[in-house]
Swiss-Prot record:
GO terms for cellular component: membrane; plasma membrane. It is found in: Cell membrane. Residues 1-84, 154-158, 206-230, 293-294, 347-362, 449-464 are cytoplasmic. It is a multi-pass membrane protein. Residues 106-132, 180-184, 252-271, 316-325, 384-427, 486-529 are extracellular. Residues 1-58 are annotated as: Disordered. This is Protein PNS1. Pfam families: Choline_transpo. The lineage of its organism: Eukaryota, Fungi, Dikarya, Basidiomycota, Ustilaginomycotina.
Length: 529
């Protein structure tokens, strides 16, 4: 009778822990993979008939993602709260955001500020209920566009890959041309370099599209088997949308309550107060939004981990992954999200400084702010890239954030998967899609404001930048939560699982395994410690 292995939230026959030694070399033409007995061990659930297991990684028998001191099974770690300090800090910030919301919204409600949908010439000299309702409609628009986009990705993966890669390159070139036409020399020089690099990258990455398409289709098929992937992504999207709408009202109410010209202004209203309040709101929004997205990401990563390591479908995989993300691993998620939130805040600050320097005609300040903003953006990109695989480690083992990041990064480098990740086009699909949806949402906001022509825009056209920036941010965040929370999460999880045990993929999808072996032969070689 075959032995069963369960790495998920329920029963079912799975694959035994990897303990075999991969072959050291492969013939290009007649490669057959593992010995038949080893494949039977994996795919029929049979134990090997030798006295001692072969060593798979190094001189110990620990699984490659398994950190030092790990206790428990894969996807079923020993219950222990990780990084509790950051969980406490997050709860304090969240409580502060709730308290500020109550204060602002109560004052806003008591002041009886005019609220209307589509009404022209709305009274008031600052953002008001008209703006908040418009932001809520923007959230609904972004929600619909996100569903349409993910449906297109599921239906036309190759076309979407081709189109997004081309659009990304063309948008970089177009933005560069726009900066030169506008006379923004400092930013134009920097983005010219980016545009040239993007054109070079386009021709280099285009030949990787067949592999990216195959990976994308494989993950989508897995998601069809575990439909809870879409349920979790939808749940995260709804929570993200609701929180974005909540924040929209808080932003408007804060302006009305703390700006001297607001209709609900009190004794504590001042320019300094509104600046401090808005900094806190923006920071809290970034952090809480990141936590929401990363909870969904970690949960979906756990589901895909269960799917990869188990031969049969596992029941309650989503609930087990979600429970761990919301309890023992929440502190680690808050830790990683805090780093990104701080970088988001710094990037927004440098963008404001650059705009102010441009309006003042300060070329030196504009250049410095632009360079600083670009540096922060680059660092943020690296952190985002790093965090994805740390969260996957957390999903698989419930590890602490720092240890998870170090363990996963070391494994990815040693297994050669970093080459695949760098060449992967899948993330471009969802990043580009989120950017396009953000632009369309901002365009909707612009048309809406043009048609309604509220009074605060008549008094100060500078509010257009605030409205469009918030609308773009809402659309971008909502769309990104869909892509990063479902298919892209599965792609990243499969990369990590492939690094740990590529032979499971060989049995489940020989075509994908063979393509990866041909382009990245180091992936199916043993790890040297």
């Amino acid at each position: 009778m075959s032995q069963q292995y369960s790495y998920g939230g329920g029963g079912g026959a799975g694959y035994p822990p990897p303990q075999m030694q991969p072959p050291n070399s492969y013939a290009q033409a007649n490669y057959q993979g593992q010995p038949q007995g080893a494949q039977n061990q994996y795919y029929n659930g049979q134990q090997p008939h030798h006295n001692a297991p072969q060593q798979y990684y190094g001189n110990d028998y620990k699984q490659p993602l398994k950190p030092e001191g790990f206790e428990g099974e894969r996807l079923q770690p020993k219950p222990k709260f990780r990084d509790p300090i950051f969980l406490v800090l997050f709860l304090l910030v969240f409580a502060g955001f709730i308290a500020l919301s109550v204060i602002c919204l109560r004052s806003y409600s008591n002041a009886d500020v005019n609220v209307s949908i589509g009404r022209a010439n709305v009274a008031g000299s600052t953002l008001n209920g008209h703006t908040a309702i418009m932001f809520m409609i923007c959230c609904a628009v972004a929600l619909v566009l996100s569903f349409v986009y993910i449906l297109l990705v599921r239906t036309f993966p190759k076309i979407i890959l081709e189109a997004t890669l081309l659009l990304t390159t063309l948008s970089n070139v177009a933005f560069c041309v726009y900066l030169w036409v506008r006379g923004n020399t400092a930013a134009a020089i920097i983005f010219t370099i980016f545009a040239v690099l993007s054109v070079i990258a386009y021709f280099f990455m285009r030949k990787r599209i067949p592999l990216a398409k195959l990976i994308l289709v494989t993950v989508i098929r897995t998601a069809e088997q575990y439909k809870s992937v879409y349920v979790v992504a939808l749940g995260g999207l709804i929570v993200e949308t609701a929180f974005s709408a909540w924040t929209s009202w808080v932003v408007v109410a804060a302006y009305q309550r703390f700006e001297p010209s607001g209709q609900a202004a009190g004794s504590s209203s001042s320019n300094a107060s509104i600046i401090g309040i808005m900094v806190f709101i923006v920071f809290a929004y970034y952090w809480i939004s990141e936590v929401i997205k990363n909870i969904a990401f970690t949960t979906v990563a756990g589901i895909f981990g269960v799917a990869y390591y188990n031969a049969n479908k596992v029941a309650n995989a989503a609930w087990g992954a979600f429970r761990r993300s919301m309890t023992y691993s929440l502190g680690s998620i808050c830790f990683g999200s805090l780093i990104v939130a701080i970088l988001d805040l710094l990037r927004a600050l440098f963008n404001i400084l650059q705009s102010q320097a441009a309006s003042d005609g300060d070329m030196t300040g504009q250049i410095l702010a632009c360079v600083a903003g670009c540096c922060v953006s680059c660092i943020q990109g690296l952190v985002d890239y790093f965090n994805r695989y740390a969260y996957i480690n957390i999903a698989l083992y419930g590890n602490g954030y720092i240890t998870a990041a170090k363990e996963t990064w070391a494994l990815l480098k040693d297994r050669g998967i970093d080459a695949i990740i760098n060449d992967s086009l899948v993330n471009i699909v969802f990043n580009c899609g989120a950017f396009i949806i953000g632009l369309l949402t901002a365009l909707f906001a612009f048309i809406y404001e043009q048609l309604t022509n509220p009074r605060y825009l008549q008094n100060d056209a500078g509010y257009y930048s605030i409205v469009l920036l918030v609308a773009f941010g809402l659309g971008f965040n909502i769309a990104l939560s869909v892509g990063a929370g479902s298919i892209a999460s599965g792609v990243s999880t499969y990369f990590v699982a492939l690094a740990e045990d590529p032979y499971i993929l060989q049995g489940k999808n020989p075509e994908l395994f063979e393509m990866i072996r041909q382009q990245y032969p180091q992936v199916v070689q043993g790890v040297n410690h």
